[in-house]
From Swiss-Prot:
Subunit architecture: Monomer.
Taxonomy of the source species: Bacteria, Pseudomonadati, Pseudomonadota, Gammaproteobacteria, Legionellales
Name of the top EC class for this enzyme: ligase
Protein name in UniProt: Arginine--tRNA ligase
Source species of the chain: Legionella pneumophila (strain Paris)
One GO BP annotation of this record: arginyl-tRNA aminoacylation
Length: 589
């Protein structure tokens, strides 16, 4: 069954064709038909500004054009009347019978209601979170996790074939810093008088990993502290450069431990942290289809293949012993190094290889979800994709602002290396998964977010997730009361008497639940899950108003059964929408 908005869009399209065929409108005119939900019930159910959009290219007054459009709109049993308002807006009033049909559809489809075929099984890869496996996820990562998972659910509901992927940065410098941090704590456990580097990872988890290494490996990797720091440059507290110092101490560790010894610390730290990240995300309801290793790009030759693909297309050149990508040819501010003069590939080369790999796996569309601090990567990634021969429109890069946590009115600073951060796990334990999942997606991803812990934990109408869940629980409570009072709910009787639902609260609710498929399609088309979060709050508000104003379990059986059909439809839509957000739908609260 087509949505009411889809019906109106079709009718308007036919009206345009009629005007073009009659010569009253240019035959080559193309326009996007936009139909919006009417904000004021007195203006109908839906409205369009099509006449205002077409006025200039058609050289006609908007109101005159609106009259011509309305005159040739085909008749449809779903539409009661059409009115022209203001400067040329066209308002549609739907028949109550058409609105009521949505209740029957919801009850028949259940959990499948709202699912569509916008995506037509197009293969989409969403890469998100992808935090360096150098420590636990913090509350900033949590927003990207919730957003990516919810976007995946929205796209699946809209008919896309979605794969969720976490890119594991297991081949970079940060992993070496973690490995050497663990080794230094290991030396500390052995009694060595270490001075921990300014740029090392300082969290409690580093001690715990070091303790595991000490318990499993004994003292076989112990070296005197003097041999570790001998002839090294100064660290920052001694007037040196912390980056130079940490690189030097990594090189010393690799020399003293040997390739296999250093790899032992590297792999143990990686596995421990990555397992913790996986457990954390699993508990948060975020499940990935693929965990893609950066190291695999080196092992399977993807790095070389990606670079070669750019070479073959003539998009590289050599300068001062390094291999460069002609990024400026594709709109970047400067060219980018792929291979340094010493033969080492750059992070950018890994990015090129990874995206070459994504398209090589047959995905039609790629969505990268980055933290806002990665804004500088957007242009260079897009230029690489374009240079590799792919349509730039097949890549979407969405930047998610990190959430800022406030406790007692104070902002909590977060830094992985300093070890002073609030983890996602701690946040979940304090406010619960449901509040975290909802709050994280309740705003546009590019908007800054202040996470109010007090609000997230409150049991009031000010807390949106509580308000929505309470609406679901209230409906379940009514159904329980039905049994307790020995009353019947005959669904067939209710469906035959939906015309009895004439109260303003009832017609409002019917209009709201009819919008659900449109919300899913719109959220998917724009990659904006917050639209669903807003909608569910609006639906919950409609339910609470109805609950407070109307005697739901009335004595008149036909009306009672009709109202229960409406209530069950609202409950189903709330359930379906909350499931997409990754939020539970409790039956009692």
């Amino acid at each position: 069954m087509r949505s009411m908005k889809a019906i109106i869009e079709y009718l308007l399209k036919q009206a345009l064709i009629n005007l073009q065929q009659s010569g009253e409108m240019p035959i080559d005119l193309e326009v996007e038909i936009k139909v919006e939900n009417a904000k004021d019930p007195s203006h109908g159910d839906y409205a369009t500004n099509l006449a205002l959009v077409l006025a200039k290219p058609c050289r006609q007054a908007p109101k005159v054009l609106a009259e011509r459009l309305v005159a040739v709109i085909p008749a449809d049993p779903s539409v009661e009347k059409i009115e022209i308002a203001g400067a040329g807006f066209i308002n549609f009033f739907m028949r109550s019978t058409a609105r009521s049909l949505i209740i029957s559809e919801i009850l028949n489809k259940g959990k499948e209601f709202g699912r569509g075929n916008l995506g037509q099984s197009q293969k989409v890869l969403i890469e998100f979170v992808s935090a360096n496996p150098t420590g636990p996820l913090h509350v900033g990562h949590g927003r990207g996790a919730a957003f990516g998972a919810t976007l995946g659910n929205v796209l699946k509901a809209a008919g896309y074939d979605v794969t969720l992927e976490y890119y594991v940065n297991d081949a970079g410098r940060q992993m070496n810093i973690l490995a050497v941090s663990v080794w230094l704590r290991y030396l500390e456990l052995a009694g060595e008088p270490i001075v921990f580097p300014t740029n090392g990872y300082k969290g409690q988890y580093v001690y715990e990993i070091a303790q595991e290494m000490w318990s499993e490996q004994g003292n076989q990797f112990v070296h005197p502290w003097i041999s570790v720091v001998e002839n090294l440059p100064a660290d920052e507290p001694e007037g040196g450069d912390k980056e130079t110092y940490i690189d030097a101490i990594i090189a010393r560790a690799q020399s003293l431990l040997g390739k296999d010894g250093f790899a032992n610390f590297h792999q143990h730290a990686l596995k421990t942290v990555l397992d913790d990240i996986k457990d954390d995300l699993q508990a948060f309801g975020v499940r990935f289809d693929s965990w893609f290793s950066e190291q695999s790009l080196f092992e399977d030759g993807s790095i070389e293949k990606g670079i070669q693909a750019l070479k073959d297309r003539g998009h590289t050149y050599e300068r001062e012993g390094a291999l460069w990508f002609r990024a400026t040819d594709f709109g970047d501010e400067k060219d980018r190094v792929l291979v340094r003069a010493n033969g080492q590939t750059t992070y950018f080369a890994s990015d090129v290889a990874y995206h070459w790999n994504k398209y090589d796996r047959g995905f039609d569309r790629v969505i990268d979800i980055f933290g806002a601090d990665h804004h500088g990567y957007v242009t260079r990634i897009k230029t690489a994709v374009k240079a590799l021969g792919h349509d730039e429109s097949a890549l979407d890069v969405i930047l998610v602002q990190f959430a800022i946590l406030y406790r007692g009115g104070d902002r909590v600073q977060m830094s992985t290396r300093s070890g002073s951060f609030v983890t996602l796990r701690e946040l979940r334990e304090e406010v619960g998964n449901d509040a975290a999942r909802y709050f994280y997606v309740a705003r546009k991803p590019e908007q800054h977010m202040d996470f109010d812990l007090d609000l997230a934990k409150s049991e009031s109408s000010d807390n949106p997730v509580y308000y929505i869940q309470y609406a679901h629980a209230r409906i379940c409570s009514v159904l329980r009361q039905l049994k307790e009072r020995g009353l019947k709910w005959d669904k067939d009787m209710g469906l035959k008497n939906l015309d009895l639902l004439e109260q303003q609260h009832e017609t409002t609710l019917i209009s709201l639940i009819a919008r659900y498929p449109e919300v899913i399609q719109s959220a998917a088309a724009s990659c904006e899950p917050h639209q669903l979060a807003y909608y569910l709050r609006e639906l919950a508000n409609g339910l609470h108003s109805y609950y407070n104003a109307i005697q739901l379990l009335c004595e008149q059986e036909q009306l009672r059964c009709a109202r229960l059909c409406l209530l069950e439809s609202v409950r189903q839509v709330l359930n379906n929408g909350l499931a997409i957000l990754g939020v539970s739908a409790p039956e009692s609260m």
